[in-house]
Amino acid sequence: MDSKKELIFKKENIGLGKRKQSIARVFLLPGDGKIIINKTSGNKYLQYNDNYLNTVWSPLEKLNLEKQFDIVALVQGGGLTGQAQAIQLGVARLLCTMDKENRSILKPFGFLTRDSRIKERKKYGLRKARKAPQYSKR
């Protein structure tokens, strides 16, 4: 466990996760299972929504490490769903840098896959990206 603690406190050991417009920088610290997002409690930041909290915790739960680490995340941009999923990706990537065996456990669950879907741009002549104004024959 000492070697893992050394890995955690290195400055370059940051898990980076992105989803839609959200970017999350994640740190794992030895602790008892707290979440701190942008210097506030994770429960408060994610508006006490269990879905968001489960999303953030899921990589640690698959490895049975949820009571051994605290998650500290700095998140920018997007909404709460995108931010929670960005934190999840950052946590999963950080766990893989800590121990190479974690990769084979997390990969089948899709925790290491970056969801590349982003908002399509609005085109001129249309109301939204694909919504056209109502067609009138006469």
From Swiss-Prot:
<keyword id="KW-0689">Ribosomal protein</keyword>
<protein>
    <recommendedName>
        <fullName>Small ribosomal subunit protein uS9c</fullName>
    </recommendedName>
</protein>
<dbReference type="GO" id="GO:0003723">
    <property type="term" value="F:RNA binding"/>
</dbReference>
<dbReference type="GO" id="GO:0003735">
    <property type="term" value="F:structural constituent of ribosome"/>
</dbReference>
<dbReference type="InterPro" id="IPR020574">
    <property type="entry name" value="Ribosomal_uS9_CS"/>
</dbReference>
<keyword id="KW-0687">Ribonucleoprotein</keyword>
<dbReference type="InterPro" id="IPR000754">
    <property type="entry name" value="Ribosomal_uS9"/>
</dbReference>
<comment type="similarity">
    <text>Belongs to the universal ribosomal protein uS9 family.</text>
</comment>
<dbReference type="GO" id="GO:0015935">
    <property type="term" value="C:small ribosomal subunit"/>
</dbReference>
<dbReference type="Pfam" id="PF00380">
    <property type="entry name" value="Ribosomal_S9"/>
</dbReference>
<dbReference type="GO" id="GO:0009507">
    <property type="term" value="C:chloroplast"/>
</dbReference>
<dbReference type="InterPro" id="IPR014721">
    <property type="entry name" value="Ribsml_uS5_D2-typ_fold_subgr"/>
</dbReference>
<dbReference type="InterPro" id="IPR020568">
    <property type="entry name" value="Ribosomal_Su5_D2-typ_SF"/>
</dbReference>
<keyword id="KW-0934">Plastid</keyword>
<dbReference type="InterPro" id="IPR023035">
    <property type="entry name" value="Ribosomal_uS9_bac/plastid"/>
</dbReference>
<keyword id="KW-0150">Chloroplast</keyword>
<dbReference type="GO" id="GO:0006412">
    <property type="term" value="P:translation"/>
</dbReference>
